[in-house]
Amino acid sequence: MTDEKLIRGIGRWDLTAVVINCIIGAGIFGLPSKVYAAIGVYSLLAFIACAVIIALIVLCHAEVASRFTATGGAYLYAKEAFGSAGAFEVGWLYWIVRMSTFAANCNLLITYMGFFWPAATGPAIRIGLIAFVVVLLTVVNIVGVRQSIQLTNFFTVGKLLPLLLFVLVGLFFVQPSNFQIGPAPEYTSFTTAVLLLIYAFVGFEVAVIPAGEMKEPQKIIPFALFVALAVVAALYILIQVVSIGTLPGLAASERPLADAAANFLGPLGAGVIVVGALISIMGNLNVGLIGGSRIVFAMGEHREMPAVLAKTHEKFRTPYIAILLNAVIILVLTIQSSFLSALAIATVTRLIIYATTCLSLIVFRRRPDAAPAKYTAPFGIAAAAVSIALVIWLVTNVDFTKEGLPIIVVAVVGIVLYYLFKIFRKSAAI
């Protein structure tokens, strides 16, 4: 199987921008207050813990990704390491995560628009705005990956500038007296805070999915992953420092960055942060559509979903059927849903998918016929083992009824669909 019917238009710094855009989403605009309410100034340690956990997982992704040039990401790695059934389950879970996350973030986008235009949250205007956003991003993605990536680069710059302004100006207004170190948090509180914060660091995996549209993906993926994670981790920690140091009522804030900015930049500063949030969410929506559609495209190529999903546009050479399918489902989900507290479910599901990629590193290292790695992770086996152990630690601390059960149900549905497709393929060509 080859991806050469797709245009390889994504370069090193393009991909770095994509990774940053994927990671920095709506989470960082709301989570600083949530983790501070849970564990106080120890939230800074939680940010560092998250950065270390994700760094280990990224290390595994970088090596595994360097073995492939095709589109598919974790789905493709699982297919080579564990076979079709495991790959379908990974692809299915990830597709569900991407669509539901898009729907939630799109609703959040409308909520933020309401800061400047209260009528935006009205039923009719809300539906119209949702449709406009989905159609706009769909057209951009169908017209070409180059145009989509250029839009992503714009969103990356647009979201980083307000955040950098927040940090660079806010550091001069930090009050050391706000950093009161109390008793160490309880184990469960710290674990919950870390799991909550992981959401702010996820999304990097979207960047490795469209490898078939990258220039020298085996070289640029490791570079982009490490550079982007370093930038994001440093920025997040500084954001938390400024939030704690400038906003005494941080624990009770619903818009912590906007409220903190209002303290040292005035109402205009709060408005700038809201604009940054809008740009950030739009950027995530764009790369989410890229990642979600490419997962379905890859599954269509492997005949684990209808082959029509692998069709590419004759002129633009983009997987337009997969993009359109994602757009239609996303539109319906977004209109009929709201921005609910599904953060833990999405995070836990992603962590499970990450664990499969870490496990595949061990499998490929021990398989003599595996494609050679263009990047070898230092202490790769140990990093993979520790990553898997950390995922198990986090996953076993979730509420089974609220998060565990829904994930199990979705996973079982995926298994049923896999065997239904398998039976159908035997009786007729898809």
Give, region by region, the residue ranges found by the protein language model.
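Membrane-interface loop-to-helix entry segments
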Residues: 110, 124-173, 184-186, 225-228, ...
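TM-loop-TM module centered on a large, flexible mid-protein loop between adjacent transmembrane helices
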Residues: 76-77, 114-119, 226-286, 304-341, ...
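Hydrophobic transmembrane alpha-helices that form the core helical bundles
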Residues: 34-38, 46, 55-134, 138-142, ...
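Helix-loop-helix junctions that connect adjacent transmembrane segments
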Residues: 2-6, 44, 120-125, 154-275
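Membrane-interface "cap" regions at the ends of multi-pass membrane proteins
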Residues: 1-33, 37-42, 54-59, 71, ...
